[in-house]
């Protein structure tokens, strides 16, 4: 299965229009949204940018509702639980806009998750660290897909306040204290950590390149072969890279 992955949007509503053109052109099987639709150090004071972004997200969700998996980023959670979960760039004047937009996404029949797996690939906003290798079930020599089920189910059923930690899939950044979880030789795809170009950290591919100076590349991953293709905003395939 070939999956188009949309990383951090941060009020750049045009990304949904380009993603739509990519889907119309290349007919990929599925779309995964990695979260962080909102907040921006550039556009964050502009409530109209919030409205346009949530409108575009709701439109995209409706069009691809049968072929889409939607994930939360830390910035969405900060609007769902403003009392306990906060992050930089938050605009409290946009709370109603963001929550109404999230409701519209759910109203087309979508569940918004924190983590998911498709084929041999695990998707989350920031990456799943090997902090989660401590789950007792993983010591029972499970089949890879069973282990991925245990991990993603545990994450998706954890309270947001308990995910407000550096090692969680909402906040994780690559480091040598907690390496990326690699149960069953999985590949991980995540955003959150800005980089000019996508890059591998062990088995984790970080694709948050949509910021000034970034390469602005969408990612397409084959969940069976692990082949990765990058597509720019003009719909050109830029280069391919496979996981070792």
Functional labels for PLM-detected ranges:
Residues 6, 11-97:
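Core catalytic region of metal-dependent phosphoesterases/phosphodiesterases
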């Amino acid at each position: 299965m070939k999956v188009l992955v949309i990383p951090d949007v941060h009020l750049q509503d045009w990304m949904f229009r380009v993603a739509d053109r990519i889907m119309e052109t290349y007919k990929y099987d599925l779309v995964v949204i990695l979260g962080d639709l909102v907040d921006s150090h550039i556009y964050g004071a502009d409530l109209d940018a919030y409205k346009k972004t949530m409108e575009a997200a709701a439109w995209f969700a409706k069009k691809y509702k049968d072929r889409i998996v939607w994930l939360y980023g830390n910035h969405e959670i900060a609007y769902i639980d403003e009392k306990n979960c906060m992050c930089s760039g938050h605009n409290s004047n946009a709370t109603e806009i963001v929550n109404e937009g999230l409701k519209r996404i759910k109203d087309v029949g979508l569940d918004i998750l924190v983590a998911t797996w498709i084929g041999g690939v695990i998707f989350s906003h920031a990456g799943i660290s090997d902090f989660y290798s401590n789950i007792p079930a993983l010591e029972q020599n499970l089949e890879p897909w069973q282990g991925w089920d245990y991990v993603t189910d545990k994450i998706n059923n954890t309270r947001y306040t308990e995910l407000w930690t550096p090692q969680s899939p909402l906040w994780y950044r690559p480091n040598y204290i907690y390496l990326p979880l690699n149960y069953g030789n999985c590949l991980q795809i995540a955003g959150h950590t800005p980089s000019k170009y996508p890059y591998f950290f062990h088995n984790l591919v970080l694709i948050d390149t949509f910021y000034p100076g970034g390469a602005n590349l969408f990612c397409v991953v084959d969940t069976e072969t692990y082949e990765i293709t990058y597509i720019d905003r003009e719909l050109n395939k830029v280069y391919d890279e496979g996981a070792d």
